Structures are given as C-alpha cells and as structure tokens.
Amino acid sequence: MSQVFDASAFLATCSARPGVYRMFDSETRLLYVGKAKNLKKRLASYFRKTGLAPKTAALVGRIAQVETTITANETEALLLEQNLIKQWRPPYNILLRDDKSYPYVFLSDGQFPRLGIHRGAKKAKGRYFGPYPSAGAIRESLSLLQKAFSVRQCEDSYYANRTRPCLQYQIKRCKGPCVGLVDAEEYAEDVRHSVMFLEGRSQQLGNELNAEMEKAAMALNFEKAAELRDQIALLRRVQDQQYMEGGSGDVDVVAAFVNPGGACVHLISVRGGRVLGSKNFFPQVGIEEEVAEVMAAFLSQYYLGNAERELPGELIVNVVHEDFAAISEALQTLRGRELTISHRVRGTRARWQQLAVTNAEQALNARLANRQHMAARFEALAEVLGLDEVPQRLECYDISHSSGEATVASCVVFGPEGPLKSDYRRFNIEGVTAGDDYAAMHQALTRRYGRIKDGEGKLPDVLLVDGGKGQLNMAREVMQELAFTDLTLLGVAKGVTRKAGFETLYLNDVAHEFTLKGDNPALHLIQQIRDEAHRFAITGHRARRGKARRVSSLEDVAGVGPKRRRDLLKHFGGLQELNRASIDEIAKAPGISKKLAESIYASLHSE
C-alpha cells in the first residue's frame, strides 16, 4: 500500500455512485483511469492488504492522489473513461496501440470513375466500401477487380493527361478510357460489376455473368464468352478463399488470448458473408488483467474510440465481461445503432469463434518467440562485447549516395524486442565533398548526438557504424568532441571476402579487431541491424535523388521557374511522361508557348 496516499481517509468520503476514477503519482502524472458502477467498492478493492496481482500492487505503491468524477450511469462513465484513456494514454491502462484510420475502397464520381484506397475523412465525392482491416486486404480486392473488370486505378491527374495507353492497358488490366479505347456504356457495366463484388453480392454477380456468357456463346461471340468465363473462374476462386460456410450479414469475430508474456486480439471482418480480412492487435497490458478485461478494453477503444469506424450488426467474442451491456448501450447512444455481442454460439459460428482464438494464440506465441529470439541475440552481444549489462538500445549508421549525389545518412534503432522504427532518422548531408563518406558520417553523428547532448533523444548503449576502421575513427572523433567518451563503439567491415558471415569487427578502437563465427547469435544481430541501416539509407537516397532529378533537367531552362516546373509535372503526371512528350504536346500545357516547349524539349533530350 502506498505510504503517501491515505486510502482510509479517501474511501471514507468516496461516493458509491457510478463514475470514473483517475490515479496520479507524487508528481501528478496520470497512472491509470478506470470506471465503476460503485466507485467506493471498486476503489476499496485496490487497497486490500492481500490478494493483489504484482503489477496492481506496483500501481498502488505509486498512488499519491485519486480523483473521481460521478456520472449519471455506467454508460456515461464508460464513454468518459474512453475519452480520458484516448487523450492521456496512462501507462497502467490496457492500451490499443493501433489507432490509425482504416482503409476503404473508394469509387470516384464521373463518367469513367477510378477505384483506389482511401483513408481518413470522406470528403471526396464518390462511394466508399469497407472498412478493411488492413492495407493488404484492400490491395487483394483491388488486384482482383483490376484483373476481372479492368476499372482504372490511376490518379485523375495522370488519367487526364494521357495521350497514349499505359502499361496497364498492355497487360489487360485497363481498357484505356483515357484515350477513348472503351465506350462509356461498356465501362459503366464494368463499374457496376465491381460494385456488386464490393457490396458482397458475388453470388448474384456470378449468376449474371453466367447468363451473359451463355448469351454471348449463343450469338457466336466466342471472344466475349471466353472473357466472361475467365471472370467467372476468378470470382469462384475468390469465393472459395473468402466465403465462410453459412456466412451472411455483417459480423466481426473477435478473440482475445493472454499469457504471461502479453496479449493478442484477433479480429476477422465479415461483410455480406465475405471475409474482408483479419488483423492482429497487441494491446499494451499495463496491469495483469484477465482475458475478459483485455476484451472489454479492446471493444471499448476500438468501437467507441473512432466515430468513423463502421459497425457490424454483431460481434462474436470468445469471453464475456460485465461491461458488454454498457458497451452496447454506449454504442447505441453514441452511434445510433444497436450492436449485438454474442458469446454462446453454435455450428459454423462456433467454428468462426474457435478460428479467431487459434489465430490469436498463434500470433501471440510467434511474437513472443521472436521477442525471446531477439533477447537471446542481445545477451550474446553483451557477452561478446564484454558489457556488464545487456544493452537496451543499439543505434547503427550508414551512408548512401550515387557517386556523391544526393548523400543520405541513416540511423536505425533496435531494442531487445526488435526495431524501434519510430526512432529511426535520416539526415540529408550537405556541404561536404562529393563522395566523402567520412565527412558525411561526421556530419550525421554531430547532428544526432549534438541534439542528444542538448537533451533531445536517448543515448544508445552501443553505437554501430557500417564501414570499418575509417568510419569507427570518425565516430570516436565525434564522441570525443561531444564528451560521450564512455559510449561503446562497434565498427562493422565486410572483411576480405566481402561475404555475409565473414565481417571484421572493431570494438572502440581499430586496434581491437576480431571476428565471430557465422552461427554466433551476436553476429546475426549485428548483420540484421547493419542490413536495416543499409536498407533505410538506400531508400532515403533513392527518394532524394529521384526528387532532384525530376526537376534538375528543367532548372536550366529560361522561363521555367519552380511554379511552372510543378505545373508541368502535374500536367503530364511526372517527369517520365514529360520526357515522352513531343514539342507539340508540351506546347499544349497551360502557359507554355511553342518556343518555350522547344527549349524544354531540347533540355530534356540534351544527352
């Protein structure tokens, strides 16, 4: 029990009505938010002398202050609790990390509409289908629709400026509406079929296509009949993959699984009897909670926390919780529609439920196995480097450029659970001699660790540099300049053969040179973080180089300033299309005279 907080005095004045409570530490930091039908009874349970779970006891030991807000009923308490959790994300609450908006398939308005992926507010005019649980699931649907019905998926700006059909037309994924190769009536029929599929009416669509195929065959239009046959075969394959036996309506199947290492919630989205996809969630579990507590927290945050998320008619769950009635009532209050939460289900629905449980268990076990595998690598690295403690943070730096052009330095960060991608950084290197990797490394490290010295960011336990002796010496120089002399440094060189597994390593100075056997877990970790730094640097370099090259060929043309360059690239849909354009086509762009078009064409084709 907390020695600071007087629980007895607090409970003596605490209300027994419904409400929300907030627990703070001695520095007034919010630790935990909860709700209760009976505030006094619920809060008293925290201050029992025995029977507390270890993490609950740890929370209670930090409590210095408790505030309560009385509400009219439990539903109001639930809504307030979710708002506070979303706003403050207290460390001891179960937190749903994934709060991104979910993607929809978007069908634009117009005579020749496009299909695409949409996230966020639905401002554009058109139709929205979904939401889909992941970008992967939505890409599968769009790929199928492109193969089956050839509705365009290009951006409107690209479409509007085509003068010849693109590659999608050549591979029969588009019918070329941009250059008039398909009439509006045929295209509208393809759009209608796509909508039927997206609305879950695949059975009706299949029957309709069958009838059209027979009609085409009777009319001896065998080419059309063959096209319809291929569409039907594709739809049947998808039905076999996506349809659940006995499925109908809109259902989310949600299963939670908990073990001492963490928690996983697996969600399967079924719309119109068709599986749109599934997704794993790994909530941050702050207190040792039962699986039912994890489920209740997930349902509250997932469905109450996002007003734009579309609700199914029913949830099938694998556990029950006393809050389910309040959650249903809150959804009806907030969203204006009922949501049935089912637990005892039979037959096919029971199989759905068990499938979700199995997926949640397997996903959590795989995540924990990977975490344990990574932890073993960190322990091996500590042993190899002679560290007193297992490092908790590794940083690795790499440099990427093309003959000195568009130099980019990367910083990637790993912890015992894997990559910490939110801490990754890239540095655009300026003002150094082209191709001078040492100067580039000096600039990147000075910028990064200068900020750390000023209190921004965390100091790693081990700093790795890709490049061997020279880069390690440069890292030592920067650390000495900034007075980080105790930081462990590790240089990674490719070795004589330049093959993976034969790296030469340098610890702290070039005199301490060593190698590791190819099966050493520490070497595997070094290779993993080195390769990730290399990948991150290359992608940044390519993006920077591509951006520079998009405008460099136009920069020397008199009369083409930054705004006109942007307008030209927008008009043609990119530099590649502008390169393909003739002088006459360039002259048709807004604000471009024939003389200026000739200058632009000459600049683009000067090499």
UniProtKB/Swiss-Prot annotation:
GO biological process terms held by the UniProt record: nucleotide-excision repair; SOS response
The organism's place on the tree of life at top rank: Bacteria
UniProt cross-references to Gene3D superfamilies, sorted A to Z: 5' to 3' exonuclease, C-terminal subdomain, GIY-YIG endonuclease, UVR domain, UvrC, RNAse H endonuclease domain
Any single Pfam family the record assigns to this protein: HHH_5
GO cellular component terms, A-Z: cytoplasm; excinuclease repair complex
Disulfide bonds: none
Keywords from the named record: Cytoplasm, DNA damage, DNA excision, DNA repair, Excision nuclease, SOS response
UniProt domain GIY-YIG: residue ranges: 16-94
Localization, UniProt: Cytoplasm
UniProt GO molecular function: DNA binding; excinuclease ABC activity
CDD domains per the UniProt record, alphabetical: GIY-YIG_UvrC_Cho (cd10434)
Domain called UVR: residue spans: 203-238
Similarity remark: Belongs to the UvrC family.
Entries under PANTHER family matching the protein: UVRABC SYSTEM PROTEIN C, UVRC/OXIDOREDUCTASE
Quaternary assembly: Interacts with UvrB in an incision complex.
Function recorded in the entry: The UvrABC repair system catalyzes the recognition and processing of DNA lesions. UvrC both incises the 5' and 3' sides of the lesion. The N-terminal half is responsible for the 3' incision and the C-terminal half is responsible for the 5' incision.
Protein name: UvrABC system protein C
Gene designation: uvrC
